[in-house]
Amino acid sequence: MTKVGLRIDVDTLRGTREGVPRLLATLHRHGVQASFFFSVGPDNMGRHLWRLIKPRFLWKMLRSNAASLYGWDILLAGTAWPGKNIGNANAGIIRETATYHETGLHAWDHHAWQTHSGHWSIRQLEEDIARGITALEAIIGKPVTCSAAAGWRADGRVVRAKEPFNLRYNSDCRGTTLFRPLLMPGQTGTPQIPVTLPTWDEVIGPAVQAQSFNTWIISRMLQDKGTPVYTIHAEVEGIVHQPLFEDLLVRARDAGITFCPLGELLPASPESLPLGQIVRGHIPGREGWLGCQQAVSAS
């Protein structure tokens, strides 16, 4: 049996309102638990449209047929009007999710984090994280124990900024296996659970067709030599491609794959995890930099 961590990112108002309830119903039908990471502040995702002037982002939008995939309400959110507060508008849905699934913070403002966190100071990072955690805890009525950086925009500064919040783990980068981030010689931070597998929007196109994606990604899960972690998005697999995701759950089960919340991947003694650090890097299919796992020597 292959155990795969299932991470569900919720970036937008529509993803929370429409995608999450459908995902909850789908997961319940198949007896699967996952980790949900919510954006809880304003939905300003439409402000990413200016990035269309960048060839790699434009190609990604065309390759994934973004208008059909996400819908114009997502693509224009926060452009001609102020972005609506996601958490306030969907508190009941978020609370229901936290009743049945591991629930953590994705971002206060997903667009702001993805656009500006790379040059924010440690203090600005801490203030933004605190704002999101405070809002999410007020909604779910219990402490937030995990987080996942929006757009995988993370580096050593983000790792340090999250330390005061005493989280059980973070999932801030792409990599191969769980690790303890090295803060300074002799001092490590909160365990990191990297995403190891590509997302739908990173690979769909000439190389991988939509109808063959499930076969392709299951093959990647079974071949993963580290600790497999797969990310879906409420805006994609919870809305337009919900039938495809349900088919994935069936096929994965038949292939001997069991999905689980990311927290279940942590060992009893996190001190046994290897050391590592998060550095800025790039991966195929995703525009811009993102956090990538890098091994470091124990010496």
UniProtKB/Swiss-Prot annotation:
EC id: 3.5.1.n3
Function recorded in the entry: Catalyzes the deformylation of 4-deoxy-4-formamido-L-arabinose-phosphoundecaprenol to 4-amino-4-deoxy-L-arabinose-phosphoundecaprenol. The modified arabinose is attached to lipid A and is required for resistance to polymyxin and cationic antimicrobial peptides.
Keywords: Antibiotic resistance, Hydrolase, Lipid A biosynthesis, Lipid biosynthesis, Lipid metabolism, Lipopolysaccharide biosynthesis
Presence of the UniProt keyword Hydrolase in the record: yes
Gene name, Swiss-Prot/TrEMBL: arnD
A Pfam family it matches: Polysacc_deac_1
Similarity annotation: Belongs to the polysaccharide deacetylase family. ArnD deformylase subfamily.
SUPFAM superfamilies: Glycoside hydrolase/deacetylase
Start and end residues of each NodB homology domain: 2-260
Molecular function GO terms recorded: hydrolase activity, acting on carbon-nitrogen (but not peptide) bonds, in linear amides
Lineage of the organism: Bacteria, Pseudomonadati, Pseudomonadota, Gammaproteobacteria, Enterobacterales
Species, as recorded: Salmonella paratyphi A (strain AKU_12601)
Coiled coil: none
Protein name (database record): Probable 4-deoxy-4-formamido-L-arabinose-phosphoundecaprenol deformylase ArnD
UniProt GO cellular component terms: membrane
